[in-house]
Amino acid sequence: MKILYSLRRFYHVETLFNGTFVLAGRDQETTGFAWWAGNARLINLSGKLLGAHVAHAGLIVFWAGAMNLFEVAHFVPEKPMYGQGLILLPHLATLGWGVGPGGEVLDTLPYFVSGVLHLISSAVLGFGGIYHALLGPETLEESFPFFGYVWKDRNKMTTILGTHLILLGLGASLLVLKALYFAGVYDTWAPGGGDVRKITNLTLSPSVIFGYFLKPPFGGEGWIVSVDDLEDIIGGHVWLGFICVLGGIWHILTKPFAWARRAFVWCGEAYLSYSLAALSVFGFIACCFVWFNNTAYPSEFYGPTGPEASQAQAFTFLVRDQRLGANVGSAQGPTGLGKYLMRSPTGEVIFGGETMRFWDLRAPWLEPLRGPNGLDLSRLKKDIQPWQERRSAEYMTHAPLGSLNSVGGVATEINAVNYVSPRSWLASSHFVLGFFFFVGHFWHAGRARAAAAGFEKGIDRDLEPVLYMNPLN
C-alpha cells in the first residue's frame, strides 16, 4: 500500500490518490501535494511552474480580448457606456481612444483592434504555457541558469523583484507617453464638458505629488483618491515609473541587507503571501478610486459617482423650480434650512436638502457655477448652460446604487431606470477580491512563518473516516 501522507512537515494536507494516473514529478507521492493543490505540485519544478504562469497570463489576456470584442459587438453608440453594462470600453475611452468632445464615441475601430490584439497575444501566451507545461524542461536551472532559481536564494529573489519593478515602471511610463505624445487622454475637466487632449504642463513638484500621500483619507481630503487634475495624475505616473525603474535597478544590483534577511521569510509560500498583500492593497485602492473619483474614472463613461448623482438631483430641481418662479436663494425647506441653497460648516454656499452631506463634491458640470464663496447665486440665475442641465438630469437618474441583480437606481426615484452602474460593479468586485486576497495573505503568511519556525506539523489524518473506505477505482 502506498504511503497516505508525506513525512515532510510542511506538506500537511494529504488525500487518497489514484496510483494509476501519474505524471512524473507531479503526483502526490513525489511532491507531497494532491492534484487539487494545483501549482503547489510545481514548487520545485521551475520550468513547469513557468508554464503554469504563462498559461495563466494567456487566460487573463484571452478574457480581456474576448470580453473587449463582446462589448464592441453589443455597443450602441447612441447610449452612454455606463448604461450598457460596459467595463472595458470605458477604460479604452478614458485613454482617449475613439472618443471626442463630451465623451461621444466617434469610432469603434480602436476598440475592435484592442480586442483582436489581446486575442492574438493570448494565443502566443497559451502556446508558450502549453510548451513549458508539457514539452519544455522541468527545471530551468541546468539549461537556462539565468532564468533558474532556488526559493531560498535571497539574491536571486531580489533580482526577480527588481525585474518586475522595472516592467511596472515601464508600464507606468506608457501612460505618460500616451498622454504626452500619442493623441492625449480624455479629460473630463476640458471646457464645455470634456474632451481628448494632450497633457502639456506636467505636475512634477514632489510637494504636490507626495502631498497626496500625506493627506488624511477622510472628508474632503481623500488621500490619493482626491486627485482631480490630469496633470497631477500623469505627473504621478512619471514619478511612479521613475521610482519603480530606479528601485528595480537597485534590487538587481544589490543583495538584501542583514536586517532584511532576518525580517523576512525566504520561501515560495512567503513570496506568495507578500504578493497577495500587495494585490489586496491594489484592490482596496481601486475600489475607492472607481467609487469616488470622477477624473481618473470620468462620469461620461462610468456614470456619476454617488455624491455626483445626489448633487445632480438637487441641481436639476433647482433649475426646474427657478424657471417656475421660485426664489432659490431664499426659499425655505421643511426643516427650516434652505430648500435649494444653504451654508456649509465653513460658510460656503452649497446645495440644500439631503444632498448637503455631499457638499464636498467637485464635478466638471458644476464647477463653472462656483464663485469664491461656493455656489454663486448670480451664476445660478444667469449662467447655467443647456449641457449642464442635460448632464445633471442624466446623472440624477443613473445613481451608482442598487443591487447587482440589475435592479438599480435610487429606490424612491420615480424617474430611475433599470440600471446598475459600472461603478457599482467595479467597486464592489474589487473590494471583495481585495478582501479575499487579504485573507489569503494571512493564510499563506501564517503557513510560511510556521514552516520557517519549525512547528508546522499539519493535520493529523489518522482518524479520518475516508482512510477506511474503499478507493473509488
UniProtKB/Swiss-Prot annotation:
BP GO terms, sorted: photosynthetic electron transport in photosystem II
Chain positions recorded as [CaMn4O5] cluster binding sites: E367
Q: In terms of one coarse class, where is the protein primarily found?
A: plastid
Cross-referenced InterPro entries: PS_antenna-like, PS_II_antenna-like_sf, PSII_PsbC, PSII_PsbC_sf
Look up and give the membrane topology term: Multi-pass membrane protein
What positions belong to the pro-peptide in this record? 1-14
Give the source's domain of life in one word.
Eukaryota
So where does this one cross the membrane? 69-93, 134-155, 178-200, 255-275, 291-312, 447-471
Which GO terms fall under molecular function for this chain's record? chlorophyll binding; electron transporter, transferring electrons within the cyclic electron transport pathway of photosynthesis activity; metal ion binding
One of the record's GO cellular component terms: chloroplast thylakoid membrane
Q: Mark the residues carrying the PTM N-acetylthreonine.
A: T15
Point out residues bearing the modification Phosphothreonine: T15
Q: What is a single Pfam family found in this protein's UniProt entry? A: PSII
- Give its localization: Plastid, Chloroplast thylakoid membrane
Q: How is the co-factor bound, per the entry?
A: Binds multiple chlorophylls and provides some of the ligands for the Ca-4Mn-5O cluster of the oxygen-evolving complex. It may also provide a ligand for a Cl- that is required for oxygen evolution. PSII binds additional chlorophylls, carotenoids and specific lipids.
Keywords (alphabetical) are: Acetylation, Chlorophyll, Chloroplast, Chromophore, Manganese, Membrane, Metal-binding, Phosphoprotein, Photosynthesis, Photosystem II, Plastid, Thylakoid, Transmembrane, Transmembrane helix
**Subunit structure of this chain's protein:** PSII is composed of 1 copy each of membrane proteins PsbA, PsbB, PsbC, PsbD, PsbE, PsbF, PsbH, PsbI, PsbJ, PsbK, PsbL, PsbM, PsbT, PsbX, PsbY, PsbZ, Psb30/Ycf12, at least 3 peripheral proteins of the oxygen-evolving complex and a large number of cofactors. It forms dimeric complexes.
Q: What is the recorded function of this protein according to its Swiss-Prot or TrEMBL entry?
A: One of the components of the core complex of photosystem II (PSII). It binds chlorophyll and helps catalyze the primary light-induced photochemical processes of PSII. PSII is a light-driven water:plastoquinone oxidoreductase, using light energy to abstract electrons from H(2)O, generating O(2) and a proton gradient subsequently used for ATP formation.
Q: So what family is this one in?
A: Belongs to the PsbB/PsbC family. PsbC subfamily.
Protein's UniProt name: Photosystem II CP43 reaction center protein
